[in-house]
């Protein structure tokens, strides 16, 4: 969510890793196929787009705008779904404020705990491309852990 500079690095990298990428942003000047060639671009509010797209256990949601008007509805929709990954750009202070806002919207502590924020692996990333690599690394890690859990042998209690 957010047709921003980090998304311009993240989208093609994720496509190279065989993710089906959709960039969602209601701002028509930002969310264009010229800025995001080769990926699906949706010019709608994220919660409305998610309703149409459907979120499921194979979905990762990343918010990148720093704008609560855009990010919070997307996070709320993602946290009320079964997506395997939810990440939000921003500092620890921004993340704490986000937690307060989403709590007021009815998101529980348990639900909010699913948000990776600050987003990405802590690799000292600075540039948009480096931040994109750190985000994708975290998404790949989350996907691998989810698959491990699904494939783990089930032990029945006696």
Which residues make up each language-model segment?
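ADP-ribose/adenylate-binding Rossmann-like module
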Residues: 24, 60, 65, 76-101
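Hydrophobic, well-ordered beta-alpha structural blocks that scaffold small-molecule cofactor pockets
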Residues: 1-57, 68-71
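Short, glycine/charged-enriched secondary-structure capping and boundary segments
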Residues: 13-14, 36-38, 75-78, 101-104
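A generic structural signal for alpha->beta connector loops
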Residues: 18, 38-39, 82-83, 111-112
């Amino acid at each position: 969510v957010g047709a921003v500079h980090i998304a311009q690095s993240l989208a093609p990298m994720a496509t190279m890793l065989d993710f089906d990428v959709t960039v969602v942003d209601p701002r028509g000047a930002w969310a264009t196929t010229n800025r995001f060639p080769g990926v699906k671009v949706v010019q709608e509010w994220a919660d409305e787009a998610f309703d149409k797209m459907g979120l499921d256990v194979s979905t990762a949601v990343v918010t990148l705008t720093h704008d609560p008007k855009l990010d919070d509805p997307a996070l709320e929709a993602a946290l009320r779904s079964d997506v395997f990954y939810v990440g939000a750009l921003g500092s620890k202070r921004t993340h704490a404020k986000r937690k307060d806002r989403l709590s007021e919207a009815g998101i529980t502590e348990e639900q909010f705990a699913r948000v990776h924020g600050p987003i990405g692996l802590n690799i000292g990333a600075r540039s948009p491309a480096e931040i994109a690599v750190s985000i994708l690394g975290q998404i790949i890690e989350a996907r691998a852990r989810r698959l491990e859990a699904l494939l783990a042998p089930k032990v029945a209690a006696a």
